[in-house]
């Protein structure tokens, strides 16, 4: 119940971030646009996140000679920084994914038993499981909390960066949306959009794939037949990817590039975190 309340609080805060990010103006941020000017015309959110991101894209695009690589480098730096800042939270999240089969067994055990005593026993068993693996359920919420405002800031940054507005990739401007690219038959931009969807799908399915591989190995170890459990969150998982694809089709392709690279970094992070979690579990 505490977790549900925590999610509700986070949802309200994240919505405020979204409204703040979406309410900003989209005037161009060039290399010579000062922080003080942004502070005068915008607000704290723009000064802290949007201006630095836009200027980082401008600088790196100028340095590499390509707005494509400018966005890629900014994305990698952002994601590596987030991984370092939220290392413990990511580790908690990975552990939570690892124990999902055991949690589902407990929930299935008490399925249909809504009396207070049964719910209390289920809660105690789940708490014992968290304690066994040294997991704080709320600790896994920090990483998503930090990532969302960055995404909103990046949305504004790519719409205002002079490098994105005036630069091109293979002769195409990344300021165009995938929807516009489809109408104009700008295929390289559509490739970025499709790659983003595929990378995002792999990213969200990676924890389940890891658990499946581990469960198969465990079954073979004990000479048992592996039965793939039903995934109660399958609709949510695929629904989230569809929702992201729907949103991104109307946002600049530069943001699809950002999300694509972020998903690749997240895939690598998931694998590394799983290795660390497995080593800790063996101790």
How would you name each of these model-derived features?
Residues 2-283:
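Helix-loop-helix
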């Amino acid at each position: 119940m505490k977790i549900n309340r925590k999610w509700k609080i986070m949802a309200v805060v994240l919505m405020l971030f979204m409204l703040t990010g979406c309410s900003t103006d989209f005037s161009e941020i060039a290399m010579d646009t000062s922080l003080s000017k942004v502070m005068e015309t915008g607000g704290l959110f723009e000064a802290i996140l949007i201006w630095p991101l836009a200027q980082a894209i401008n600088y790196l695009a100028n340095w590499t000679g390509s707005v494509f690589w400018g966005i890629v480098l900014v994305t990698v730096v952002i994601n590596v920084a987030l991984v370092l800042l939220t290392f413990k939270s990511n580790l908690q999240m990975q552990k939570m994914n690892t124990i999902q089969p055991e949690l589902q067994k407990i929930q299935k055990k008490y399925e249909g038993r809504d009396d207070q005593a049964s719910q209390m026993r289920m809660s105690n068993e789940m708490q014992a499981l968290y304690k066994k693996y040294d997991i704080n359920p709320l600790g896994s919420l920090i990483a998503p909390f930090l990532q969302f405002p960055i995404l909103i800031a990046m949305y504004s940054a790519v719409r205002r960066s002079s490098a994105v507005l005036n630069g091109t990739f293979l002769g195409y401007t990344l300021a165009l949306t995938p929807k516009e690219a489809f109408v104009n038959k700008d295929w390289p931009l559509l490739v970025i959009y499709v790659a983003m969807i595929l990378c995002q799908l792999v990213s969200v399915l990676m924890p389940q794939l890891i658990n499946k591989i581990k469960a198969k190995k465990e079954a073979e170890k004990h000479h048992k037949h592996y039965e793939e459990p039903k995934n109660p969150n399958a609709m949510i998982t695929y629904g989230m990817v569809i929702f992201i694809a729907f949103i991104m089709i109307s946002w600049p392709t530069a943001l699809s590039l950002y999300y694509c690279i972020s998903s690749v970094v997240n895939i690598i992070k998931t694998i590394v975190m799983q290795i660390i979690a497995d080593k800790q579990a063996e101790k």
